[in-house]
Design a protein with these regions (language model features):
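Terminal, compositionally biased segments used for targeting/anchoring and flexible tails
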Residues: 1-110
């Protein structure tokens, strides 16, 4: 079986986890609320703009203030809190998976 097939199997296994199901459910709640969905998408755009490309320290600081303000406004919304919690749990699962892959590769280099 090829590497692409194994990667597909890994993705399917990740999608079969409780963490993914909870994240998907939390995202669906946000997606049903047009206004909230728009605010979350705007927050993601601001994050991407901050972390992509080369910008001056002053511009980065300005964007960070904007991002912090947007996050602060959303942080009081229960649906957003749930989305962030489930996203964090799923990211922990991904990090653990990547750590295990890395350890296996490192062991193979010895």
């Amino acid at each position: 079986m090829g590497l692409k097939n194994k990667a597909y199997e890994l993705a399917e296994a990740l999608k079969a986890t409780v963490e993914f199901a909870e994240l998907k459910q939390a995202k669906a709640v946000i997606d049903r609320n047009r206004s909230l969905k728009s605010e979350v998408e705007d927050l993601k755009r601001k994050q991407t703009a901050l972390y992509s490309g080369r910008i001056s320290a002053k511009e980065a600081e300005s964007r960070l203030v904007e991002l912090d303000k947007a996050f602060g406004q959303l942080s009081g919304v229960p649906e957003f809190k749930r989305y962030m919690e489930t996203s964090g749990k799923f990211n922990q699962l991904l990090n653990e998976t990547f750590r295990q892959i890395n350890e296996s590769i490192e062991a193979g280099l010895r």
